[in-house]
Amino acid sequence: MGNLKSVGQEPGPPCGLGLGLGLGLCGKQGPASPAPEPSQAPAPPSPTRPAPDHSPPLTRPPDGPRFPRVKNWEVGSITYDTLSAQAQQDGPCTSRRCLGSLVFPRKLQSRPTQGPSPTEQLLGQARDFINQYYNSIKRSGSQAHEQRLQEVEAEVAATGTYQLRESELVFGAKQAWRNAPRCVGRIQWGKLQVFDARDCRTAQEMFTYICNHIKYATNRGNLRSAITVFPQRCPGRGDFRIWNSQLIRYAGYRQQDGSVRGDPANVEITELCIQHGWTPGNGRFDVLPLLLQAPDEPPELFTLPPEMVLEVPLEHPTLEWFAALGLRWYALPAVSNMLLEIGGLEFPAAPFSGWYMSSEIGMRDLCDPHRYNILEDVAVCMDLDTRTTSSLWKDKAAVEINVAVLHSYQLAKVTIVDHHAATASFMKHLENEQKARGGCPADWAWIVPPISGSLTPVFHQEMVNYFLSPAFRYQPDPWKGSAAKGAGITRKKTFKEVANAVKISASLMGTVMAKRVKATILYGSETGRAQSYAQQLGRLFRKAFDPRVLCMDEYDVVSLEHEALVLVVTSTFGNGDPPENGESFAAALMEMSGPYNSSPRPEQHKSYKIRFNSVSCSDPLVSSWRRKRKESSNTDSAGALGTLRFCVFGLGSRAYPHFCAFARAVDTRLEELGGERLLQLGQGDELCGQEEAFRGWAQAAFQAACETFCVGEDAKAAARDIFSPKRSWKRQRYRLSTQAESLQLLPGLTHVHRRKMFQATILSVENLQSSKSTRATILVRLDTGGQEGLQYQPGDHIGVCPPNRPGLVEALLSRVEDPPPSTEPVAVEQLEKGSPGGPPPGWVRDPRLPPCTLRQALTYFLDITSPPSPRLLRLLSTLAEESSEQQELEALSQDPRRYEEWKWFSCPTLLEVLEQFPSVALPAPLILTQLPLLQPRYYSVSSAPSAHPGEIHLTIAVLAYRTQDGLGPLHYGVCSTWMSQLKAGDPVPCFIRGAPSFRLPPDPNLPCILVGPGTGIAPFRGFWQDRLHDIEIKGLQPAPMTLVFGCRCSQLDHLYRDEVLDAQQRGVFGQVLTAFSRDPGSPKTYVQDLLRTELAAEVHRVLCLEQGHMFVCGDVTMATSVLQTVQRILATEGGMELDEAGDVIGVLRDQQRYHEDIFGLTLRTQEVTSRIRTQSFSLQERQLRGAVPWSFDPPGPEIPGS
């Protein structure tokens, strides 16, 4: 399809195969193994469906079924075509005659059958296709596979036919191109864009679909392969047909003297167009209108808008007179009269397009005697001797015509490929197919180009021609024979009617294109913010596309191969990991193979989390395939995701060392697998204008997608409209309805957070700090009741779902406008607009929250303590009665810098905002639909189940602080404050989140260094308890560990001092070092200082010489500083450069021997946070202006020691 011949009214290629290569080209083929040639040797049996990694045998195979032996006469290589055993149809040749040079062998034409197709025949073809599809997605034999086969069988039994799913249609259309033996450009088969037009009902709708196909495929000269599939053939109903052989063709006018002006190949269709009302011109290059036929209706005439047809005037780079010949040709070759067969289903109207091979225009269209026949005219202009063939005037003129074609298309920036590049790519395709499928059907007579035959590699390559399914097949012209049902001549349409048809088409184009261009929006989220952004993106893309919004764990990654447009919005969890609901997606994405990394390499077997943490533009692997991708062209193989266009937006915090690591990795991986990036990676920093960054990226992504798929005429206006506060929430579209059911808390939390919740109970809460300390750190002991869902291993995390403070809830309830009764469970209902063919307009329940009272929603489910987002401030501005408050809220929501300064200085709760802007009304539906969800709080488990069965211990710093530089209101940590006030027996909703990358090594003899200041000691308590159990119960003698702890003062906050000393005396620890940052009379010391001054040699020995492990737990600044210190230690002690030491740490991470458990920002990181925000402001502002790409990431700040 990369270079398609017009197959409607053109004769075949020249005969004369040369070198005897025609032998066996078209030997009679059957569904079983073909009869071998005398020179063939027996070959091994072919599996029903060869495995993708099948390699061609290079030696004579053992006895068994015989397969064609295929030789390349240029290099002498030999392969065996085992795929030919799966041929679905007999070829036209017999044992006594070769019909390989016939253009339209009658045996290969697909003709409508009288009555329904035999059920068993259709079922056999359907089963074979469904098996192919499920093999391709590696789901063969699965329950879904068996269920699909049963569905098809039942549908065929009931209706005599069946319907393909959209993914099956996409797969089938691509396979049909892949199986086309006469196409030389098949290496790009994976990049075919499939447009599903099976909902088409009229010829007018056909024309609209075709206009969109032409617009998309032409793409302002950067041609893209595409196919539009109209409804299938059905028993008892006529066909959808396109009478033209190509969507764009030049008219041929028969003159009185018998000559033809224009293209002689199109005389018949030209006369038919005139009979159906077309007013012809009299030029040599008049674009024909289209004759389109809906079932059982006469054909209708439609004129293509002139601006839709891209044409290239032909000129020569050195022959100035060539332009005066007035030659031109159209850019887009789009074959429209062939039938697409998939799984026994026939689609008589399935126009497909690619791009030209230059010799198709330069030799066949312009030089063939029965076409434009310009060869002698050009030769005369070149002063060549045309009286004798020995002057080779034809060859010389033909070369210059081809040079002119290539030059003109390249000058006009229109995609075209020369015959040398095209045939070289076909040889690569043959090699790929031999490895993947064991063979490749190819018609030598059509593959060898009509110029420079033996100068191209395909001339010397033997080929085997056979016919697989799915396939493109020839079919009779619709106005001839039995196909002419309903093809009567209609009255001539007036010019006004034709013009109106064009006008109607133009108005419908965007609507219909949107109807069939689907967009998948995937999100991975820990806090719900990525989900909220994805839903906003869905509302935006609904303006011009058919979007669906899915969580990553609800999506089958194999569907990526059949997607046209995917947008990803994802956060990054902890130390650069995927969010939990993105882990399965990440793993599956890593397992896929791409066009530039298909060979197995050790580095590709890294843990997907580890590789995600390290993927960057400087990664040698990434740089290698990115260079190959940049150098690729239309003659290179497409990847598994060749038709995919994608955009990625990442959410994160630049305070973390792996900022947006998962989003970066998804963006990198999708490109690596062959996808086309529409927009550079977008990144939203929670420290600086995240929402504004998302809005700017979303609008840019929407505009890029609209331009790519030729939809959405006013993309910018649509984007502005969707982000308007008046559009995002309207009073009249929401209402409260009373519900009979009352809230059950655990099921309610399970519903909201989409994960199973369990109830533990408090055993005790103990303050670990001295009574003289002004701060508090508590040890919380929970009773799990032996519940299986609360089982854990040391190093794992627990998620706790806290309630909001009752006083804060009551104060907010007093501000609610017209609240429902306090004890009455309610649910929010939203007024949904109806859609044609969809559900009617009506009130639909919002599923975000379970039925509950407003007080319960504010207590358990909604976040009322975090500063309101700019989007929420914009909504509140529309509800303010005072104009000054409305203007202030609007200004805060629109100015990112002003908003960030306000947020970080005041850190206001929702109640404090309402107190600052008292005229704001607060409707209950707005609270229930627009406030963010109250997120679980994660803590490292501080116990070992072997030491405390049925219990979970937590070490929690109780948070309390004043905003506005210590002069503002007192704020409390939601979870830590709540847990500090609990009593024995109180319930705690919670769940376990495993941390498999932060666990002690299975071999207890490996040395370990543990580094954790403050509450960073929490997971290590579980470690030493587990080791004590190994020593005293199991009788093991593990290698002593080294603990490096840090706190402020030895007399106030030295956590677990007695426990640590006891563990050291009993053999768990070899060394225990403590850094005090504020001890009176002692220098300020941090844990990284102890590593550098006391443990440098041991760090190097443990990590580089003894295969040991290092564990670091703490906030982001401490973890980063420790990492930098370890890097310097390895460089100094190991005698290496700093960069080399960094590579060593990368290897340690790959081997999972350097472990980090990083928790969020604390009050100590405020200085660093402020500095990061300051650096990020200018970046964000430049991104929004378009001055820098979205993926630009400045160097991280220098982070001081903790």
From Swiss-Prot:
Please list the cofactors this protein needs: heme b; FAD; FMN; (6R)-L-erythro-5,6,7,8-tetrahydrobiopterin
Assembly and interaction partners: Homodimer. Interacts with NOSIP and NOSTRIN. Interacts with HSP90AB1. Forms a complex with ASL, ASS1 and SLC7A1; the complex regulates cell-autonomous L-arginine synthesis and citrulline recycling while channeling extracellular L-arginine to nitric oxide synthesis pathway.
Binding positions for FMN per the UniProt entry:
525-527, 529, 571-572, 653, 660, 686, 690
Q: What class of enzyme is it?
A: oxidoreductase
Q: Name the residue ranges with Pro residues bias.
A: 33-65
Record the organism. Mus musculus
Activity control mechanisms: Stimulated by calcium/calmodulin. Inhibited by NOSIP and NOSTRIN.
- UniProt: (6R)-L-erythro-5,6,7,8-tetrahydrobiopterin binding residues: 101, 445-446, 459
> In terms of one coarse class, where is the protein primarily found?
membrane
Which key words are in the record?
Calcium, Calmodulin-binding, Cell membrane, Cytoplasm, Cytoskeleton, FAD, Flavoprotein, FMN, Golgi apparatus, Heme, Iron, Lipoprotein, Membrane, Metal-binding, Myristate, NADP, Oxidoreductase, Palmitate, Phosphoprotein, Zinc
Where is the stretch described as Calmodulin-binding? 490-509
Q: Which domain of life is it from?
A: Eukaryota
* Entry binding sites for Zn(2+): 93, 98
Phosphothreonine sites (modified residues): 494, 1174
Q: Which InterPro entries match?
A: CysJ-like_FAD-binding (IPR003097), FAD-bd_FR_type (IPR017927), Flavdoxin-like (IPR001094), Flavodoxin/NO_synth (IPR008254), Flavoprot_Pyr_Nucl_cyt_Rdtase (IPR001709), Flavoprotein-like_sf (IPR029039), FNR_nucleotide-bd (IPR039261), NADPH_Cyt_P450_Rdtase_alpha (IPR023173)
Give the matching Gene3D superfamilies: 3.40.50.360, NADPH-cytochrome p450 Reductase, Chain A, domain 3, Nitric Oxide Synthase, Chain A, domain 1, Nitric Oxide Synthase, Chain A, domain 3, Nitric Oxide Synthase,Heme Domain,Chain A domain 2, Nucleotide-binding domain of ferredoxin-NADP reductase (FNR) module, Translation factors
What is known about what this protein does? Produces nitric oxide (NO) which is implicated in vascular smooth muscle relaxation through a cGMP-mediated signal transduction pathway. NO mediates vascular endothelial growth factor (VEGF)-induced angiogenesis in coronary vessels and promotes blood clotting through the activation of platelets. May play a significant role in normal and abnormal limb development.
UniProt binding sites for heme b: 183, 474
Q: Where in the cell is it found?
A: Membrane, Caveola; Cytoplasm, Cytoskeleton; Golgi apparatus; Cell membrane
Return the protein name. Nitric oxide synthase 3
* Annotated lipid attachment (N-myristoyl glycine): 2
Could you say which EC number(s) this protein's record lists?
Answer: 1.14.13.39
Query: Which regions form coiled coils?
Result: none
| Residues that hold NADP(+) according to the record | 775, 1015, 1048, 1077-1078, 1084, 1086, 1088
Q: Where is the lipid attached (S-palmitoyl cysteine)?
A: 15, 26
User: Which reaction does this enzyme catalyse, per its entry?
Assistant: 2 L-arginine + 3 NADPH + 4 O2 + H(+) = 2 L-citrulline + 2 nitric oxide + 3 NADP(+) + 4 H2O
